[in-house]
């Protein structure tokens, strides 16, 4: 008899039981791993699968996390074969070419489209009912690409969008007012990145509109220069990349925040990238961030934001820029 047989007496043969809330992270780069650890530490799933084409890096990251299994309640698996991702509830795609210092997110696009042509069909094959969350940049265009390649209904494909931009915005407003970001309500919509749109008209603390107190807020004529805060949001990622080479922690936490709302069916509102055709005067098939309700079925509702004419114009301009790039893509 083996030690195991001497220690344990078998009562019944276990049937394989699928995990009810399995999450897959595609890509074990900086963002993928920050997302993975954030999801693990928030205890969001029974099983976390990781997949990547870089076999050694993947194996090392999976082993490193598994060595911490004692401190977690999640089964951790990883393989370059997508069968390891089977029956995922949420699949987070972080894989792709990384933004170089000074490179715009839009410049990355065709490089990443080609990578997606391999990834997306594999996800669909093994998790045909999953909710697909795109994080790779340029996120709005790649969410559109994932939607097209997957054939999924629009409510099951979303991009991490401006969830992080809005978090940065709220953090910076909080710094200026000496308040916790959760008490500073503020939204950034539109494109994740350089042409994102700060909705100054909606910025409030405890229901008190800041623009009501300072009508010039967010304009050139504002003596307090609140506009600089949005510039800081846009430049924030570039600044972090310049200083440490990449961004990871905040986007990882942002991803876990979105995964939590889906898995726990929270019906929380997040600014995420979705199909906005027909909203805010957008005519083309583009994905941009607007406030959306997230739950177990995916992206269930969109909140009608009252945008000022100038804000709406900026959203339309973003949409035109993205469509200009999208229509040149070979899918």
From Swiss-Prot:
Biological or metabolic pathway of the protein: Fermentation; pyruvate fermentation to lactate; (S)-lactate from pyruvate: step 1/1
Reaction it catalyzes: (S)-lactate + NAD(+) = pyruvate + NADH + H(+)
Subunit: Homotetramer.
Xref: InterPro entries: L-lactate/malate_DH, L-lactate_DH, L-lactate_DH_AS, Lactate/malate_DH_C, Lactate/malate_DH_N, Lactate_DH/Glyco_Ohase_4_C, NAD(P)-bd_dom_sf
UniProt-listed Pfam families: Ldh_1_C (PF02866), Ldh_1_N (PF00056)
Record's protein name: L-lactate dehydrogenase A chain
Entry-linked CDD domains: LDH_1
Binding site for substrate: 105, 137, 168, 247
Gene this chain is encoded by: ldha
Annotated keywords: Cytoplasm, NAD, Oxidoreductase
Subcellular compartments: Cytoplasm
Class of the enzyme per the UniProt entry, highest EC level: oxidoreductase
Species of provenance: Paranotothenia magellanica
Molecular function in Gene Ontology: L-lactate dehydrogenase activity
Function, as annotated: Interconverts simultaneously and stereospecifically pyruvate and lactate with concomitant interconversion of NADH and NAD(+).
